Amino acid sequence: MNKPIIALDFQTYEEVETFLANFSGESLSVKVGMELFYSNGPIIVEKIKQQNHAIFLDLKLHDIPNTVKSAMISLAKLGVDMVNVHAAGGKKMMEFAREGLEIGAGSGKRPKLIAVTQLTSTSEAAMQTEQIVKASLLESVLHYSDLTKQAGLDGVVCSALEAEEIRLQNGEDFLRVTPGIRLLSDAANDQIRVVTPEKARVIGSTNIVVGRSITRANDPVKAYNQVLKEWNV
């Protein structure tokens, strides 16, 4: 079964532990982002891995190629399952990121590597005025997606609204990891291009990241099972 990735948007391990206790004995796919990683350091990954959960380490690296390569060598040694970079860092940076993961993983399996195209909080108007990008939002996402594939990465982070176009351009096996997923009853909050788990499945996402709809729910297990059901119909 293709499990949704739960965004552990907490500051402390105690909060994470309390949340994960709801799923005792179950192996989940979770996302550790900047807030949690920077507050706790690499030990947070070790503690979560001890509970047999798959980890997407969402740090969105974006720096000069050699710096990113060195960072990826270290991150690969943590035993995470997936990491990411910003595609805006360029093809060479992404290639160096992949090489770093291969070195860090050694004889083991390297983590999946995906690239952020445009954040789901970014509107087309904001992209064009603030980033001075004259293309449409879709054109920008497809450009970054193509660059990502050329660099030998496994896929991209994208809105579900662009997932089908990316599939047609880059192939079925190219990962399309979609944040901004909400149950129909939830507010969109700070993300603009949001969809439901069911719609994400229908329009071509390969993986979904769900945060508040599960982590802030009165009954996280019930909410998770609802997302799981919609995502795997």
UniProtKB/Swiss-Prot annotation:
EC number(s) per entry: 4.1.1.23
Function of the molecule: Catalyzes the decarboxylation of orotidine 5'-monophosphate (OMP) to uridine 5'-monophosphate (UMP).
GO aspect biological process, one term: 'de novo' pyrimidine nucleobase biosynthetic process
Subunit structure: Homodimer.
Reaction(s) catalysed (UniProt annotation): orotidine 5'-phosphate + H(+) = UMP + CO2
Entry protein name: Orotidine 5'-phosphate decarboxylase
Signal sequence annotation: none
Pathway assigned in UniProt: Pyrimidine metabolism; UMP biosynthesis via de novo pathway; UMP from orotate: step 2/2
CC terms in the record's Gene Ontology section: cytosol
Active site (UniProt): 60 (proton donor)
Residues holding substrate: 9, 31, 58-67, 120, 182, 191, 211-212
Classification via Pfam families: OMPdecase
InterPro entries: Aldolase_TIM, OMPdecase, OMPdecase_AS, OMPdecase_bac, OMPdeCOase_dom, RibuloseP-bd_barrel
Gene that encodes it: pyrF
Family: Belongs to the OMP decarboxylase family. Type 1 subfamily.
SUPFAM superfamilies to which the protein is assigned, alphabetical: Ribulose-phoshate binding barrel
HAMAP family in alphabetical order: OMPdecase_type1_B
Organism annotation: Listeria welshimeri serovar 6b (strain ATCC 35897 / DSM 20650 / CCUG 15529 / CIP 8149 / NCTC 11857 / SLCC 5334 / V8)
Source domain of life: Bacteria
Alphabetical UniProt keywords: Decarboxylase, Lyase, Pyrimidine biosynthesis
